[in-house]
């Protein structure tokens, strides 16, 4: 999970009440140990709570809970963020799941297709060398059925950042256009990514509630695009499958 930030920050820092806090890409939750809260044969919940270590680099109290529920061939991932403090909690959150492509070394990645639940060309942004959003008017063309063949140079400039709810369902498809995996979400934006030039046999389909800063951004945490705000006691709950 990417929390409390998605992507990189301008100058690798954020500002709260006039104070600058250094922060690396994607925040810190992915590098911390979560507590197992509950477990059954088909569901597990994990929790991460703010502590002295997190408060020193991110001055907000939080409770982050993540649930995984298996139902047949479907996995539902649920994020629940609670603000236990009296002051507002500002955060971003996103997924970073990776899926095999090609499957079992059958063909090349460029033989496969993406399928989106739209027949309109997708506008996407690209990340510059500093990890920030730069050019955001690129076009990913899909056919009338939503298919787009994966190009071997598709990820040469890092992730494709797709904003404005242009799609809510993305499938990976075999060379004969048969979907073998679908990610469904209600996020305002999502990313598509695979390591550039490494021949990595996977593609990430990432629902996001937040993203990296633009190269032109110059403001405080409250002014960041897609920042989520919880008042005292409020709960943020989202899921994807």
Protein language model features and the residues they cover:
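Acidic/His-leaning functional-site neighborhoods
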Residues: 21, 26-38, 144-225
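Hydrophobic residues positioned within well-ordered beta-strands of beta-sheet architectures
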Residues: 44-46, 64-66, 77, 93-95, ...
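Beta-strand-rich interaction surfaces with strong enrichment in secreted/lumenal proteins
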Residues: 65-67, 225-230
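Active-site/ligand-binding surface loops and adjacent short beta/alpha elements
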Residues: 88, 98-185
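Acidic-aromatic substrate-binding/catalytic surfaces of carbohydrate-active enzymes
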Residues: 1-19
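Extended, loop-rich substrate-binding clefts of extracytoplasmic carbohydrate-active enzymes
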Residues: 17-72
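Short Pro-Gly-centered flexible turn/kink motifs
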Residues: 14-18, 79, 228-241
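Acidic, contiguous internal or C-terminal segments within carbohydrate-active enzymes
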Residues: 50-103
